[in-house]
Structure formats: structure tokens, C-alpha cells
């Protein structure tokens, strides 16, 4: 099974991402519902600019984060660790992402928060359902996939 396909399939079934941002030695993490775009390998989220994590991000920043389920046994652990870049979307790019986000989360129509993109550059997917400690790695720039 192709690594990115397996990762994308799993991410499409989840809905909460945690990401962390750093500014001048200070770290902060946040959680949000996300829409995953498998073609761009990116999450789309809504978050207000006044939040601590948005203030630390500025218009764009490096991030790292996770998406994980809540299994009751170690054998069922599945999750993603990633690094990438967050940026606030503007104009048509923002409008298109918001429409797609609103289709997945209709309640978001009530929110005026800006749309942000978290572009993933490296993904490590742990899937213990394929065997304890099974890891798959995807890297954007090298096209490398490791199983």
C-alpha cells in the first residue's frame, strides 16, 4: 500500500489536529477541527488571529504536531506526527478552503475566524494494527516513502 495513500485515508477519518508553534524560544500548542486535502497534503483549520498560537505564528511559521485516535489497547494505536508550515490564507485561496471546510463542518458557517493552511512537509504514521511499532514515513521534498 502506498504510504501517502494509507496516511491520507486514515487522516480523512479523523477530525482534530494538534500543532505547536515556537517564537523567540516560547512554545505553544493548539487543537482544532481540520479538513485534510490529500492532493496538497495540507490541513485547513479556522482559528482567530487574537489567539496565542496565531499571534506567535504571524502570517506564517514552522509547526510540528500530531493527529491521534484514542484506542483502548496498544495494538490499536494509530497516529501521525508531522512537521510543516502554517500560514493564514487570503482572498480566493481562503474562500475556496472555507467552502470545503464548511461542507465538512456545517456549524463553521457561523464562524468568522480566518482560514489557515498547515502544509505538511514530513509525516510519520504509526499503525500498530499492521504490527507493533509499524511506521510509515513520507517526505514532501524528496518524494521519499519509507515503510
From Swiss-Prot:
Family per similarity comment: Belongs to the UPF0306 family.
NCBIfam families from the UniProt entry: PRK03467.1
The protein, known as: UPF0306 protein YhbP
Domain of life the protein comes from: Bacteria
Organism placement in taxonomy: Bacteria, Pseudomonadati, Pseudomonadota, Gammaproteobacteria, Enterobacterales
Amino acid at each position: 500500500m502506498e504510504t501517502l495513500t494509507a496516511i491520507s485515508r486514515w487522516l480523512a477519518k479523523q477530525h482534530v489536529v494538534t500543532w505547536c508553534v515556537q517564537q523567540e524560544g516560547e512554545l505553544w500548542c493548539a487543537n482544532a477541527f481540520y479538513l485534510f486535502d490529500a492532493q496538497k497534503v495540507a490541513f485547513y483549520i479556522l482559528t482567530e488571529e487574537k489567539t496565542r498560537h496565531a499571534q506567535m505564528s504571524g502570517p506564517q511559521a514552522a509547526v510540528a504536531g500530531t493527529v491521534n485516535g484514542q484506542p483502548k489497547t496498544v495494538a490499536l494505536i494509530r497516529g501521525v506526527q508531522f512537521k510543516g508550515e502554517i500560514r493564514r490564507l487570503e482572498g480566493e485561496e481562503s474562500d475556496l478552503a472555507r467552502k470545503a471546510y464548511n461542507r465538512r463542518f456545517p456549524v463553521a458557517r457561523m464562524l468568522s475566524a480566518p482560514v489557515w493552511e498547515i502544509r505538511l512537509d514530513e509525516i510519520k504514521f504509526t499503525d500498530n494494527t499492521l504490527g507493533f511499532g509499524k511506521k510509515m514515513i513520507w517526505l514532501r521534498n524528496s518524494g521519499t516513502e519509507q515503510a
